[in-house]
Every structure is written in structure tokens, then in C-alpha cells.
UniProtKB/Swiss-Prot annotation:
This is Trigger factor. Keywords: Cell cycle, Cell division, Chaperone, Cytoplasm, Isomerase, Rotamase. The gene is tig. One of its GO terms (biological process) is protein transport. PROSITE patterns: FKBP_PPIASE (PS50059).
Amino acid sequence: MKASAEKIDKNRVELQVEVEPERLDEVLNQAYRKLVRKANIPGFRPGKAPRPVFERFYGKQSLYEEAMEQLIPRAYLEAVADTGIQPVSQPEVDVVQLEEGKPVILKIQVDVKPEVVLGEYKNLKVERQVAEVSDSEVDEELEKLRNRYAKLVTIEEGTVEMGDIITIDYEGTINGEPFAGGSATDRSVEVGKGFVAKDFDAHLVGMSTGETREIPLSIPEDFPNKEVAGKEALITVTVKEIKRKELADLDDEFAKDVSEHDTLEALRAETRKKLENAAEKKIEYVMRNALISEAVAGAEVEVPASMVDARLETMMEEVLRPVIEQGMTKEDFFKLTNQTEESMRADIRPRAEESLKKELVIDRIAEVEGLEATEEEVDAELAKMAEFYRLEADRLREILEQRNDLDSIRTAIKRDKAVDLLVANAEIVGQESTEAEK
């Protein structure tokens, strides 16, 4: 087989492929053997009709169609390997010549991985904040811990208070008509958390189990259903159960109950350390992303529309899959969020293109710098993943190999190394902050 590649646009090539007549004869025979098994030809058992008889009965075209379904994908993959192109879209195939006894001639157009012209990616200047944690942040985290380990006690007698966990049914109407997102049954609500709006929870205080109350509500402007946002509604609420938190005292006994520490002081120190580590990770992420953006800004790269389209589909699926899994249709989701599928695509598309630019630039830096993922590094990453998924590392490797996903791990390692290189060669300006970035 002969194959050549010609650049016809910035990120698009045309493959010219010539397949030997003998190979065409071979796939035509394979097509005949496959189709004749299902053929119903008078006077012959299935699979026994000679090829000339089959062709007279079904026509040669049926053989050619079946043969090309086998030949084109194989020829395309071989041409890609022979020419060394990196396709990023589905191929568009034009059969130029298809005659028995003559070479098959194909013209195949496909988008390819775009060329990246790097700008300056060393000595970039970036600002990095200093992670600091205030006493009030530590206190807030300990209070969350108290609430997390609080006992919930059912209140048989008594009324709703701020901080209670109540189960309610509610139905909202506007001018007597129900609206999307305005009703639910057995909804658990923590009173005071601003279930719908901050002033709404105040109307729940004082209600008793079994009581129904009509509560007027000005629907917030940021309500998901934009058709009713800002309008006046009437919410009919029935309280079905009241539970109240019993908080433990914040002392050494509490520290022993919720941690491995014997004293509140030790628990407080550990809490501060965790908050500092989280702040450091966030600041590190922001700094690394800023460096990537700087490197992209200095580079020249044009992402093919086909690549953006594919990434856009992936990002759309990531948004919609959880919605559908929860039983909501796409149509209801778009109505609830006051958008259309087209407007959502338009919003996401720039992010899809930007994410691809970042990957292409970082991949090019890794290539220029000769960065690779060693097998030891791949094994270490597999060990982390295996621990997370509670699998044996060898079993995880087997699964990833079956899915052809091991290369994605190698790519991720190389990209991390490329960003590490940006950081190592950057001019990092520290900026004091009184509190950790939130």
C-alpha cells in the first residue's frame, strides 16, 4: 500500500492512499464468504452458492460495499501510521477509484493535531499569596466538627427553632398556579440556612409537627427558574418532623471522641495544620494555572473546530449526566435554569477551546524539554489510584490497559512535569495576606 499526506489547510491534511488490486481481491473474497452464509438463493443451501451465482442474484455492488467497510478503516489506520500524522477528527473518505483488477484509490481528509509555536515560557512572573489561617477560621472549623458529631433528637412536643432539622412538604404557587422547582415532599431543611430565602426560614420558627402554614415569599432573583425569579409566591408548608441538634461541649473529651488526640489543644493544632495545607494547595493551584495561562498567552496555536466540538460534547455530558441520573430530563433542566441547549453550548465552548489550548501548549513544552513519564512514576500513580478505588495495582493496570487508558496516566505525569518546570523557572512574587484565600 502507498500513502502520502498533503497539508491542505493549517490543521488539515489529505491522505492519498493506493491499495493493491490483490488486496481488493482478498477483501472481496472475504466479503463474499461472509455474505453468502446469509444468502437465500434458490437451489443452494446457505453458504454454498458459488460467487458468480451470488453476484448475479445480489449484484456485485453488495460485495463492494461489504469489502470497503472492511478495507477503508484498515487502509486509513495504516496510512496514519505510515505518514506519522496525528488525527484529531473523524476522517472524510472519498473513493476515487474502485474497479476489480485495479488499485483502490482513496482520498481521506482529516484534521490533525495543531502545531504549537511556543513563546517565552521560562522566567514568567507570577504572584503567589502566603497561606495564613486565622483563629476565627480554626474556631469555625471546630464548630463544624461539633455540628457534624451532634446528636439529633426528635422533638415530639414543642415548636421549630433556628438550627432545627425539619422534614417538610411544600407547594409553591404564583397567582394560584404551581411553578417548576416550587414543590417537594419529605424535604429535609436546616432552619436558618436560607432554604429558599433568608427571611423564609423565620416563618418556619414556631411551627409544630403536623402544622400547615401559608408563607408569602418574594422569589430571589438568583432562583434557578428565571421565569419566576423576582415574583411574589405563596408557599404552603407542612411540618412532618422536627429534630434538634445536641452539641457536645468543646473540651478534651470531645477531642478524644472525634479524633486521636487527648486534648482540645492538640485537636486545634491539627485543625489549623489541615486548614493551612488546604490553603497552600489552593494557592499552589491558582499559581500553576496562572503560569499555564501566561505560557498560552505567549504561544501561537489554532485549535481545529472539530477538537473543540469533541471537547464541548464531553463537557456537556459532564454537566447533564448527573441531572439525567437524578431522573430529570434535559428539557426540564434547561427550563429550570432558564437556558437552551444552544445557549449552554455557547457558554461552554470558550472554556472547551481554552482547556485544549492549555493542554496543547503544555504538551509542546514537555516535548521540547524531553520530559517523559518513567515506569516507576506510572507505577506510583497506579498505586495511589488503586488505594483510592480499593483495587490491587496489577488489576487496575490490567483494566486500564484493556481500555487503552494507561497513556492518559503517562500524559498527566508529563504535563505535571511541564508545569513543574514552569514553576521552577518562574519569578514568583510572594504577597502577604492576613487570611488564607477563601
